[in-house]
């Protein structure tokens, strides 16, 4: 993918997973793809599906044919309007579709303490969302000043996802002396 090289090889698949690339495999079934190119699917590591103004099922129709197989989605926009019901809608609409949608819990609802929104998700709400199995981690913690200051609510949200991925968001942090501490260094 990165070098632009094309390798002529066989691909061994077992239980729906690629288990080998090369030659000399013994197969119970073969598919001739001579002249075809097989490439990995694209994983979009950060997307807000709602920004496309369509639900996940419609979003999938646009991105899957173009090679995207998986998205890591932070549904904080719909959560700011509809709260936990919005997140549950996103999960239901994405289920069983052709696109793997990995939802993260929206950490910033409302988006900042300076704005209002249709919902508020506190640490308890996010802990319940984690327990529901609908999310795989904590999405985009945008309140990096709160992280650096050890704000109790922000830290409780992060703590609710101990052992899972917690996404950060720190524009302009750069060489800030606390930068290493923000990532646990």
Where do the language-model regions lie?
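Divalent metal-coordination and catalytic microenvironments
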Residues: 11, 16, 35, 46, ...
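Short beta->alpha connector loops
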Residues: 54-55, 143-144, 171-174
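Divalent-metal coordination cores built from histidine and acidic residues
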Residues: 57-165
């Amino acid at each position: 993918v990165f070098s632009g090289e094309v390798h002529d090889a066989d691909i061994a698949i077992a239980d729906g997973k690629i288990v080998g690339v090369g030659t000399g495999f013994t197969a119970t079934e073969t598919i001739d793809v001579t002249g075809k190119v097989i490439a990995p699917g694209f994983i979009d590591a950060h997307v807000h599906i709602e920004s496309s103004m369509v639900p996940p099922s419609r979003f999938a129709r646009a991105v899957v044919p173009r090679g995207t197989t998986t998205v890591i989605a932070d549904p904080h926009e719909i959560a700011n309007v509809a709260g936990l019901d919005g997140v549950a809608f996103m999960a239901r609409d994405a289920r069983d579709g052709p696109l793997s949608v990995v939802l993260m819990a929206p950490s910033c609802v409302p988006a900042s303490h300076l704005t209002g929104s249709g919902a508020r998700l506190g640490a308890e709400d996010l802990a319940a969302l984690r327990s529901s199995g609908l999310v795989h981690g904590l999405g985009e913690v945008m309140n990096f000043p709160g992280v650096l200051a050890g704000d109790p609510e922000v830290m409780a949200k992060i703590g609710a996802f101990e052992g899972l991925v917690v996404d950060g968001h720190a524009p302009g942090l750069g060489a800030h002396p606390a930068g290493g501490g923000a990532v646990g260094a």
